[in-house]
């Protein structure tokens, strides 16, 4: 408790400096106004890619329609009610602000009325008890997106999610914390409008109290299992039909080798022959040093450090190909460490008949974590980690500003590591950690401390495996991430809360698989 009080004091000090220092003033109606963006960000498409890739951020006002639970529904039976389609003329007069859970005002709202989580006073009180709902947004597809692959991209939606385009279902998702995308190329047309429906059922509707536990998906701690709705960014993306789908950067420091595992996607009707090539540049941090400017992304590419030699790639129609590129390193790259968090940018291009088809950017650090016994090694040398850990507590943490303040406090205590606890944090936490030199023990949303996960359910374990896989794929290129915590307190809960030691072999096998 004392440690938490100290950390809270440090965080408060960082934000509550004199008004002039933090850009605050008082408006004519007596409101305290902060004159800088609450959540500064760069978007999904990097500026080096924008000649070839496009995006429209769909954040902002959406229409909202609550759906009542049927009278026959019984909580805790493991069978969720069906989500009926939205009704014409039944949309709420109050629009929802995306990203935000629709029941946000009920989080941490017991005897103390929040206090700092009542961030959406316009939301009707009845939304706090809604368990399933629809959200609607109309968007116009730009004329210059003709011939592109078009995707809807969600950074995170809490609940069982169904997505419709122009009243036709195009996809679904049931993970509360991780990104997903849906190809809608054949459902929309350049120059025309599209109506997006997103239907969400709270994970609590799927809970099963028949034996031990109740939650059938990894749902995190207090924040995760409570919220419902679109709680992170939404984008509409346009990609070239032939593009780099994924880049896995492997900094093999001990072998003096940088390995790039590149997946190239061909969404055309014919085989494509092309050339894959690239370069590696210094990533230079230009962020400010005061409390307002330091959390704001600001950078430029520095000198070219290495070239990625061109290779020929042949991709069948409507298929993908994985290419492994190896770049020898002989002192051209400086180590990433907490003391010197040097970063680099990989820039890969696809070229056919001297025409560049696509450009892909990926940031990384030249570092390698290894274990010898119980000792952590960073770049071949023993490295001691001193860290902090905390639960995710909602809207105040939905900004790089909080990550910067938290990590600044950690650095100020002569520490260098963090464990974002009990759920998957938004990816900008890892971005800031990369830039500030904070070592991250990433943790899944498999949090068992309240006895909530249904650890005897095959549904839970299948969801957990997919959850872990998607988590690693999201964060594996971050220089700051040194490990993966796959669960929290599962063993003591199995042994001392459930009193079911026979479940231990099942858990061990699930993670081994």
How should these model regions be labeled?
Residues 117, 384-389, 442-455, 472, ...:
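Aromatic- and acidic-residue-enriched carbohydrate-binding clefts of CAZyme catalytic domains
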């Amino acid at each position: 408790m004392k440690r938490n009080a100290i950390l809270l004091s440090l965080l408060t000090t960082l934000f509550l400096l004199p008004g002039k220092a933090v850009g605050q003033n008082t408006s004519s109606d007596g409101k305290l106004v902060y004159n800088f963006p609450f959540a500064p960000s760069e978007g999904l498409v990097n500026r080096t890619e924008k000649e070839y890739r496009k995006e429209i951020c769909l954040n902002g006002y959406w229409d909202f329609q609550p759906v009542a639970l049927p009278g026959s529904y019984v909580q805790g039976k493991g069978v969720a009610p069906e989500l009926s389609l939205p009704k014409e003329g039944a949309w709420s007069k109050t629009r929802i602000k995306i990203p935000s859970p629709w029941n946000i005002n009920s989080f941490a709202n017991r005897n103390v009325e929040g206090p700092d989580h009542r961030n959406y006073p316009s939301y009707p009180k009845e939304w706090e008890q809604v368990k399933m709902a629809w959200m609607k947004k109309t968007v116009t597809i730009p004329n210059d997106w003709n011939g592109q692959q078009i995707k809807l991209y969600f950074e995170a939606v809490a609940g069982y999610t169904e997505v419709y385009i122009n009243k036709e279902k195009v996809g679904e998702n049931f993970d509360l914390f991780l990104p997903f995308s849906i190809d809608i190329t054949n459902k929309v047309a350049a120059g025309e409008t599209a109506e997006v429906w997103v239907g969400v059922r709270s994970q609590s509707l799927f809970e099963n109290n028949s034996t031990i536990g109740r939650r059938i998906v990894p749902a995190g701690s207090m924040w995760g299992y409570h919220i419902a709705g679109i709680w992170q960014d939404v984008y509409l993306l346009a990609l070239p039909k032939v593009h780099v789908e994924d880049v896995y950067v492997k900094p093999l420091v001990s072998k003096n080798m940088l390995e790039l595992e590149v997946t190239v996607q061909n969404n055309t009707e014919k085989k494509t022959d092309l050339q894959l090539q690239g370069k590696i540049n210094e990533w230079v941090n230009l962020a400010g040093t005061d409390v307002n400017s330091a959390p704001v992304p600001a950078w430029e590419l520095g000198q070219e450090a290495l070239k990625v030699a061109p290779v020929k790639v042949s991709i069948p129609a409507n298929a993908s190909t994985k290419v492994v590129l190896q770049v020898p390193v002989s002192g051209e790259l400086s180590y990433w460490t907490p003391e010197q968090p040097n970063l680099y940018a990989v820039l890969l291009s696809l070229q056919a008949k001297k025409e560049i088809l696509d450009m892909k950017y990926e940031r990384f650090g030249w570092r390698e974590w290894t274990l010898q016994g119980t000792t952590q090694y960073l770049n071949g040398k023993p490295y001691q980690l001193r860290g902090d850990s905390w639960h995710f507590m909602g809207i105040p943490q939905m900004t790089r500003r909080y990550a910067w303040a938290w990590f600044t406090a950690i650095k100020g205590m002569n520490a260098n590591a963090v464990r974002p606890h009990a759920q998957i944090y938004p990816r900008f936490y890892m971005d800031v950690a990369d830039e500030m030199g904070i070592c991250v023990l990433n943790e899944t949303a498999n949090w068992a401390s309240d006895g909530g996960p249904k650890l005897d359910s095959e549904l839970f374990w299948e969801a957990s495996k997919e959850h872990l896989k998607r988590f690693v794929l999201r964060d594996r290129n971050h220089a700051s991430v040194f490990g993966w915590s796959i669960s929290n307190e599962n063993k003591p809960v199995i042994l001392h809360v459930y009193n079911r030691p026979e479940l231990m072999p099942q858990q061990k096998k699930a993670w081994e698989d």
